[in-house]
Amino acid sequence: MQPPSNSAGTATGAENATDDLSQANLAAGQRVFRFDTFGDEQFWTDTAKMNQVVEQNVDPTTALKVGLKVDADGLPPGILQKVDLKSPATTVALLKMNAVVGVQAVVDANNHITRLGITCALCHSTVDNSVMPGIGHRKDGWPNRDLNVGAIIALSPAITAAQKAVYNSWGPGKYDPRFNIDGKSNPLV
């Protein structure tokens, strides 16, 4: 997904900030919030190799345990009763449907994840759990307090055992955006 066409070419298009709250602008903002990765696939795919981790090792049950959410409105009716929630292939299928809140993936014809990125919605959306815990209707703008960013990053093969220990110590709802820069773990809510 590309930023709205009235963007000034910056990541945020801030130069063209507007008070126009038309339905078209609101819909464009919602699309950016939900689906735009701002190019972070470079980190999540090229550096952290999370596309491989998700494709090979992350089944929906594991994804839900680390706090990822599934948008029930992105699922065909009755699909959850027909799929294996213990299979990473099901996670790939959910990504193809854009049903994993805050995670965008490019999946090729052979069901391999070639690019993986995250959006604002990963941390700043949740679901109402109307289908089951972690699966329901989106609630954009609500914090995902179940999200365990440290446990997710710790799955990466690109980090050391010492880093994994730090990431795994954070727990749900906490994150330290400076850890990779200063090496000091100070996760915040």
Question: Where on the chain are the PLM-derived regions?
Answer:
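Bacterial Sec-dependent N-terminal signal peptides
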Residues: M1-A17
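Extracytoplasmic redox metalloprotein regions
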Residues: G13-V189
